[in-house]
Amino acid sequence: ADILRLMGVVSGTGDDRFDPSGTLSRAQFCTMVVNFLQKQDDAPRYATRTIFSDVKSSHWARSYVNLAASTMVGDDQEQLPLISGVGDGRFLPDSQITMGEAATILLRALGYSSKQAGAVWPQGYMDLAGSIGLTDGISAGAYSTITRAQAAQLFVNALSCKDAGGKVYYEGLGSVLPQKTIVLAVDVETDDGSAKGAVRTTANKTSEAYLPAHGDGDVPALQGKRGHLVLNDKDEIVTFVPDDSTATTVVLSGNAQPGSVKAAGGKQYTMSSDTMLYTSGATEGKAWTDGYTDLSAGAQITMYSEKGKVVAVYSASGTTTIDSDAVVVMDHATAATFHGLTGGATSFRVMKGRQTITLSQIQPNDVVTYDQIGNTLMVSDLRLSCVYQNAEPSIKAPTKISVSGGKEFDVLESAWDSCGSFKPGDSVT
């Protein structure tokens, strides 16, 4: 849903919830389509018109329904309204929308008509939707009502579908940056500090951070993703479309090496000297050989591959180190637990394995670092079992320990007290 939130297509149902299992009315879907077409600024001009008898002046979606009904799509041979009523002058705005209706509306938004779909409705439109990838990943019959999550998937699919003219839809929404982009941080301040809600990316023309044209820049699910960024003529974000390269997220079991990294579980990944490394705190990437030393054991990275080769790496916290910039959670976590990391900030986001979680979902012994740029707590549950061998400066108050295999680890300040209870020869995790 964050792709659509960035575009202004959705905004949740209140309390910052998207409610993916909730149903969707015809009026709600119509509003989403208008926003998807980036026509929301035109809606107020249609508020005084009466097109459907049951979409009265008091209806919340009147302007959007009227705009959609007045928007003609198709080609020179056939023009159809984006939406139509039920045949008796009514629109039934509060009835739940079906899969067939939703697919038909989006196909029309892409410029298709009965010339391509045929005269049999809804099956002709459903077949056409399937052939262009519009219904990929959605299991619903033509007459089945759809959930908000299914509707969101339709819109996300539509971004990458070809329109009736053979052009990929998102490419016609604005200027597509020539290089694939990684979203480094979200909901950040603009360069001049005049506004918040910008998105910082790896591909910048005139600024480090872009504001969305219509939507919300607080899109944590997109942070660290790589894809195509589309801007309007004001250098505002119209949309972001993740690409189809393979993305693999791992936690490092040891320090990164000049030509490789090893993940928890022992799997090793090869890095080329020209593999690019990006962090949330930088606007430009580094070649792997120039930046790999910033990645220590416990760092979480996302690797992007093309044709079997890792071409880019993203690290949410950049210079993740095992020092006082991290906290081991020993009991129930509260905002106060991380006061030393955040400097007292309490409006942070919490992420674990690329998923947003709550403080109550952080478990004892989880390790938490803080990404100041993104105002995000990054949670890791990496566990390594080994034999404790020695400690410095003393076993009772260790700041550094050595374990079997000759490896050394710094001890977090928050774990000093608990580590003092162990002695050489103990098996520890």
Which residue ranges define each predicted feature?
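Feature responds to low-complexity, polar/acidic, surface-exposed segments characteristic
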Residues: 1, 11-66, 70-101, 106-145, ...
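Short, flexible, surface-exposed loop segments at domain boundaries
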Residues: 149, 153, 159-206, 211-274, ...
